């Protein structure tokens, strides 16, 4: 079938298998150009492995360090001529490329928050890997059903204590709009922490440790975004910020647990990129469009694979890791360059409907958004029929 993009709000409801595969190959090629990751991991579990930063981590570990990988994700398979999700096709392509290079790859499709998937993961590690020496936690989900209580918690994107008015882009109409966000209630804050805080990461590490499948010297990292002044009302001072602070508290306990056996636990702070999650946040399309404009002009623009490949080489397995005062690994230094942030702030209130395409790189933002779903990738013939029914080898469901 011929598949074209169909966008509704912040979601593209179609995906292109060949485009997703080409995107994965592009990321693999980037890692290969940079050469082997010295002293890198050899047996890696990535929780949230099918898109964005999690996929990039799996690619960097496998094709940069030669690691065997186990990926956990929650994706929809193709069915009845209806395409699957982008993460499904990304993972299928990853498996194909790994097999072609003799790299061990196993994937598990299911709810990472559940005890069932944790147990399946432990069984798979015992069978295929024995133990893992790196656990990457890269889960972005709007809700979580707690495995012990059965309660489903919904995350909320709201400020705390006062309403906040945000500038943004109505991406459907390509117009500047303002959104008034009301403050979160105590229950909404608690629910957001339950979904996006550190509890599930801790549950994973506790379960893996108790099962004896964490190697001596094992490391774990959870990915997060903090941002700067223009995004702080939402990302640090809001409901999501409370979840990020919970992550910072959680990592201290995990670090103590792993350090006893020569390991480490760190929160890794990555730069703002276009993801399905970030595109749903009212201010982020405008911020990202401005950030792209400024960073591309300076030659410092990076996407997921550049960020995570650099994180592994420079910090997780580098001799001189970039660590902030709170002990987090920082890969977002170029975004937070004062010259970059000053220029973004200067342009922030100047953007109008008329100059959207000149003051910002909204065109680049839209292109990156479509790339998430396999569209706009060089070398792909989008007028040619493509087979949507793609299977993932070594998949556990």
From Swiss-Prot:
Molecular functions per Gene Ontology: enoyl-[acyl-carrier-protein] reductase (NADH) activity; NAD binding; trans-2-enoyl-CoA reductase (NADH) activity
Entry annotated with the keyword Repressor: no
Top-rank lineage group of the source organism: Bacteria
Pathway(s) per entry: Lipid metabolism; fatty acid biosynthesis
Keywords: Fatty acid biosynthesis, Fatty acid metabolism, Lipid biosynthesis, Lipid metabolism, NAD, Oxidoreductase
Positions of substrate binding: 225
Keyword hit for Lipid biosynthesis: yes
Binding site for NAD(+): 48-53, 74-75, 111-112, 139-140, 244, 273-275
Enzyme Commission number(s): 1.3.1.9
Top-level EC class as recorded in UniProt: oxidoreductase
GO biological process, alphabetically ordered: fatty acid biosynthetic process
UniProt cross-references to InterPro entries, sorted A to Z: Eno_Rdtase_FAD-bd_dom, Enoyl-CoA_Rdtase_cat_dom, FabV-like_NADH_b, Trans-2-enoyl-CoA_reductase
Described function: Involved in the final reduction of the elongation cycle of fatty acid synthesis (FAS II). Catalyzes the reduction of a carbon-carbon double bond in an enoyl moiety that is covalently linked to an acyl carrier protein (ACP).
UniProt similarity note: Belongs to the TER reductase family.
Quaternary organization: Monomer.
Protein name as annotated: Enoyl-[acyl-carrier-protein] reductase [NADH]
